[in-house]
Amino acid sequence: MRILIVNKFLYLRGGDCVHSLNLKQLLRNAGHDVCFYAMSYSQNIVCEENKYFAEEISFSAKDLQGKIKAASRIIWGIGVVQNFKKLLEEFQPDVVHLNNIHSYLSPIVAKLAYQRGVKVIWTLHDYKLICPSYSCLCKRNTCEACFTDKKHVVLRKCMKNSFPASILAWGEAMNWNKNKLSLWTNSFICPSQFMAEKMQQGGYPASKLQVISNFIGEEQVQYIINTPNPIREEAYAYIGRLSQEKGVESLLKAASRLPYKLYIAGSGPLEADLKKKYTANNIIFLGHLGIMDTIELLKKISFTVIPAIWYENNPLSVIESLCCGTPVLGRNIGGIPELIETSSFNRLFTQDEELPSLITKMFNTVVSANRDELSTAALQRFSGEHYYQKWLEVVGKE
């Protein structure tokens, strides 16, 4: 088959980008012809189809023209249509596989593919289709008000705590609504059962929702298998974005009361403030790590912690940890329980107050874990081959 993968960016920026790049390699290894569509950006991987990419826009533009251009992209997809049509005409895809496309690109790509009779598959990495501000959070609390009435994003200033930004998010949601998106899309891939249930609550038909967990890329698999396991440190780690919805400050508060070494691997808007605030010797900020450095960290620590306060979908950080044979302590929220309830060495928590005692318990219990067995089981569960077979089933659905 000829498959066109669409994502906002084409470099190792976040989980959606990692998934898109891994999917490309998986499908090419299976003998398919694959190309990309993204927004032009200086850090993108260079490929032949770069010439068709959408013009770059900035949401931090200060001038009126830049703001109008950004708003026009969000509401109407201005700057996307012409080149995407050209790519469809030249590449002639059998399947267009969408990932994160709102704002920097546009859902108009689903419409254009649909109008040409091309099958559209859409992997959902966040809750944008039912929550205009992506995260189902309002004032640090989970919120589902917009599942049935999008005006709440404006009333509560959910987007960046700004009326203009929230009005724009409302306009985007009203234009690219569930009726249009359901018509243009053959199947939505929900990486967790939790997400599929929330999509149904938001009005999307169950018949269009298929649950397939994310997978780990072949390059990562080989590195995990071929890298010797070091002696485990009496240390644990948080690996991910340093932003409010990730709940990392809850973990840092707990770590400040404990003697164990905590590695913080990641960057984001809270990075500078957290570094200033948490200066204890047992808390080590590593910054953003590449894929291979992440694996090496996972192999040497005792366990990871996922303290997210939002509805985590199917976090790659959990999958990568499990595939390295490293247990996980995760908040009982979103799709996290689906990933970690398969082993007695993993634990769930609900309240921040539980963290200090549970972290101590984790250190006491993981010492008896057979890391090789845990890794082997996870690598099989989250293999590319398993994902590919499920993907073929979805593509075959009408």
Tell what function each PLM region has.
Residues 327-330:
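Short hydrophobic beta-strand element within catalytic cores of glycosyltransferases
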Residues 75, 353, 367-396:
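A charged, aromatic-enriched C-terminal amphipathic alpha-helix characteristic of glycosyltransferases
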Residues 18, 234, 238-257, 269-272:
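A conserved mid-protein helix/loop that constitutes part of the nucleotide-sugar donor-binding site
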Residues 194, 215:
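Carbohydrate-associated surface elements
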Residues 342-354, 361-367:
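Conserved acidic donor-binding segment of nucleotide-sugar-dependent glycosyltransferases
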Residues 272-292:
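Nucleotide-activated donor-binding/catalytic signature segment of Leloir-type glycosyltransferases, i.e.
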Residues 1-43, 116-119, 253-256:
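N-terminal subdomain of nucleotide-sugar transferases
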Residues 115, 128, 144-187:
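Membrane-proximal helix-turn-helix segments that form the acceptor-binding/catalytic region
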